[in-house]
Design a protein with these regions (language model features):
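Mid-domain catalytic core of redox enzymes
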Residues: 24-146, 150, 163
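A conserved beta-strand/loop element that lines the FAD pocket in flavoprotein oxidoreductases
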Residues: 15-27
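Short, well-ordered alpha-helix to beta-strand connector turns
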Residues: 16, 46-47, 206
């Protein structure tokens, strides 16, 4: 995707032919005749619903029509994260590998990973300079919630030099972008697969309601898309 993931979701939206409502608040799902009523900006009844939302959100929406499944979903915990995107004038000294993962507990390093984007994707390298993405936030810490943008950028530059030897300040920092993801990463504990199986088994008794998402399938676009396709086909 030469212009980012927006190419993917814009193409999917166009190809779907569906009516898509953006910023449409939904407060609850209840029985409505032979279907399900979605309460929000409009009270609308649907034959089938696929919930593609984080587990805690699904728990809130299902508490009336599937309380046991909702209770199971409440056990899925989430982690917050923050991403710092940086563009440098020069890529001299940047390692040739695609990225770096930082072990939990590493001393004097707050970042958990770096993606050396201009090394990983050739079309980004064509733009010149260097593009690097630093990731922060692990389960149980609050960096993504409490750190200022200035702190995140400083840590990203410091940690990048510590981990790779690349001095971003000397390379010429030209652009910065900070994105926070609140509750964006589900925590997969040793009981997680059993939880997913239990939720889906309980929802089998509620004909017309299905569920998908990163908490159920695993993080990453390929895993999420594959699971969503399976769920969608079950409704056909």
């Amino acid at each position: 995707f030469r212009n980012g993931y927006q190419e993917l979701y814009e193409t999917l939206a166009e190809k779907s032919g569906a009516d898509i409502y953006i910023d449409a608040f939904v407060s609850s799902i209840s029985r409505g005749g032979e279907g399900f009523r979605i309460k929000g900006g409009e009270d609308t009844v649907y034959d089938h619903i696929i919930l593609a939302v984080p587990a805690p959100t699904a728990a809130l929406l299902l508490k009336e029509i599937a309380p046991e499944a909702a209770e199971k979903l409440q056990t899925v915990q989430l982690a917050n994260s923050a991403v710092v995107g940086m563009r440098f004038a020069s890529d001299e000294g940047l390692p040739e590998n695609s990225g770096v993962l930082v072990a939990n507990g590493a001393e004097d390093v707050k970042a958990k990973a770096f993606t050396l984007s201009s090394r990983k994707w050739p079309h980004l390298a064509e733009r010149g300079g260097a593009l690097v993405r630093a990731s922060f936030g692990r389960f149980g810490d609050n960096i993504a919630l409490t750190a200022t943008e200035d702190d995140l950028v400083d840590w990203a530059l410091d940690d990048l030099k510590t981990v790779t030897g690349f001095d971003g300040r000397e390379a010429g920092l030209e652009e910065i972008y900070v994105q926070r993801w609140f509750g964006g990463l589900p925590r997969f504990d040793e009981h997680h697969l059993d939880t997913v199986a239990a939720v889906r088994s309980l929802l089998d008794d509620v004909a017309g309601i299905s569920i998908t998402g990163a908490w159920a399938s695993g993080v990453g676009v390929p895993a999420v898309v594959a699971d969503a396709r399976v769920v969608a086909k079950q409704l056909l």
